[in-house]
Amino acid sequence: MRRLTLWVRTASTATLVGVGVVVAAVFVAANAVASLDRTGAQPPAPASLAELTLRELGGNGPEGITANFRYANALVPTTSLVPQASAGGSPLPLVTGASGRLWYTNGRLRMEFQTDQGDTQLVVRGTRALMYDASDGTAFAATLPSIATLGRIRTGLAGASQLLGRVRSSLAISTPHPGVTAGRPSYTVHMAPVESPGLLSKVALSVDADTGTPLLLDVYGRRQTKPLVEFALSNVHYGAVDPSVFKLKLPFGMQPVPVRFGGPPSLGATVSCTAPPTLGGLPLQSCREASRSGELPGRLLIYGRSFGSVVVLEQPGGGDPGGGLWALLPGVSVGGAEGRELVTPLGAVVRFARGGVTYTVLGSMPHAVVEAVARGL
């Protein structure tokens, strides 16, 4: 003790300050670790994939969700997207990603994408959506396609094991891994296409073990070490959400620009097909009638199998294939016909008109394969 006292008396001020800082840092770190041990979430008990599937599809979910989110999208190369899709020199957050806040309850969603140029607000109520971009003062209103598949699964699930049996023929799904995500007990599942030549490598999904809420979604392309798309929640809180949150007031006198989304076509019976038996090295697997309400029936062709397939939608009428939202995409020539095209690390889509028919060709395949199918039609 006397030696310690002597050292303290003879040590320089700088030495004493340095020792004091180290001791304080160790004390703070120890208390932080102890706090985590007391209040931190713990991984849930192991669960089989069938148990987790039944819990996810059969549960009702929380009353409401309030959370921060981080959204990153490296799919769409902004240099190839026309300038109309950017505002103030900064691409729209829906294209490149952003961070922000979200609220959700009973089919209603509000998201605030926060950027340096100004926030973008998105409110969805059922099939109606309203978006306001403060960076350039524009608003859009849309009616989204109605998709009732999830509701049918929730009310008519005969058995999670049977459902998984059908899915596993084309998708390899890992055993749920217990862990902690966004401060919540969670299960993480990895999914990858089975023997697919397509560009999708795998999808990683983490869900809340208690509520089934998706907490983290990562989508990877082939030969990609980082996710091409990521959506992550943080600071998640469950409970009632004030209904006023979902009321978005536009500036006085502003009228939103209407945007139309065509719903998915209804598929009919298999029909006789005069399409080429092979395109882009892929065999023709299916040819079915496809139609939308109020439109002449067309055809839906599928070349290849599962995730390694290219889908062709043929619609009667040789209207402008670059109208509406398609006008945002770069132009392309397909066998002398002008069209629109979008190429991403996860696949490509080509749309053009020829001979009184509008063709939409898409697939999670290399760009050259999708274009070869389009040119062979």
Range-by-range predicted roles:
Residues 23-56:
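C-terminal region of N-terminal signal peptides and the immediate post-cleavage residues
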Residues 98-157, 226-230, 350:
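An acidic-aromatic
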Residues 117, 199-202, 345-346:
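Short, small/polar residue-rich loop motifs at catalytic or cofactor-binding pockets
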Residues 58-83, 107-111, 188:
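A short, Trp-centered hydrophobic/proline-enriched beta-strand micro-motif
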Residues 69-70, 110-114, 187-195, 217-220, ...:
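Short beta-strand segments that buttress and anchor functional surface loops
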Residues 174-254:
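Gly/Pro-enriched, hydrophobic low-complexity segments
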Residues 74-98, 260-357, 364-375:
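Short, solvent-exposed recognition patches
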Residues 1-21:
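N-terminal export and membrane-targeting signals
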